[in-house]
């Protein structure tokens, strides 16, 4: 059987998990005080789709826009380690690479903190041109 070639186009981001426990309420405000025990980072958004496709044995290419920051480098490092092909990942210095941080205490999500750019992307024509050059190399395209 031949390997499926999938092209994933979408928002790459980091999912950051902060795991801890809570045994008291803050005296400053009625909120839980979380004692951090562990932290982990993995691909989120379209990156989660990429990771799942790779785990199923597909060959995966990626088209996306990231910020020009350390988080983008972390996303690219994880993609490389997983074996994804960087077809077209544009670094935009005006954008923040998205990070979704979730604080977990006693197996419950306490809060999610989003750090991201929500403005429309400015490099649409570059993405469309890049897509036009490579889409025929893939069996399936996921948006």
Predicted regions and their residues:
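A short, aliphatic-rich alpha-helical micro-motif
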Residues: 1, 135-136
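Positively charged, low-complexity intrinsically disordered leader regions
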Residues: 1-23
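Short hydrophobic segments within beta-strands
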Residues: 9, 63-65, 104
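Short acidic, glycine/serine/threonine-rich loops at helix termini
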Residues: 14-22, 71-76, 99-103, 115
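Substrate-binding N-lobe of the ribokinase-like
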Residues: 27, 32-99
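Conserved phosphate-binding/catalytic loop of the ribokinase/pfkB sugar-kinase fold
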Residues: 89-95, 102-135
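Short acidic, glycine-rich surface-loop motifs adjacent to enzyme active sites
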Residues: 138-143
């Amino acid at each position: 059987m031949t390997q499926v070639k999938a092209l994933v186009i979408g928002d790459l981001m980091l999912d950051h998990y902060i795991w801890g426990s809570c045994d008291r309420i803050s005296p400053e405000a009625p909120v839980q005080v979380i004692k951090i025990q562990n932290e982990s980072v993995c691909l989120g958004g379209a990156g989660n789709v990429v990771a799942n496709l790779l785990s199923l044995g597909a060959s995966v290419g990626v088209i996306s826009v990231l910020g020009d920051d350390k988080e983008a480098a972390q996303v690219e490092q994880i993609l490389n380690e997983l074996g994804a092909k960087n077809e077209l990942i544009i670094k935009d210095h005006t954008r923040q690479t998205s990070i979704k941080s979730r604080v977990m205490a006693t197996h419950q999500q306490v809060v999610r903190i989003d750090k991201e750019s929500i403005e429309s992307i400015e490099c649409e024509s570059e993405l469309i041109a890049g897509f036009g050059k490579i889409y025929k190399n893939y069996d399936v395209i996921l948006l």
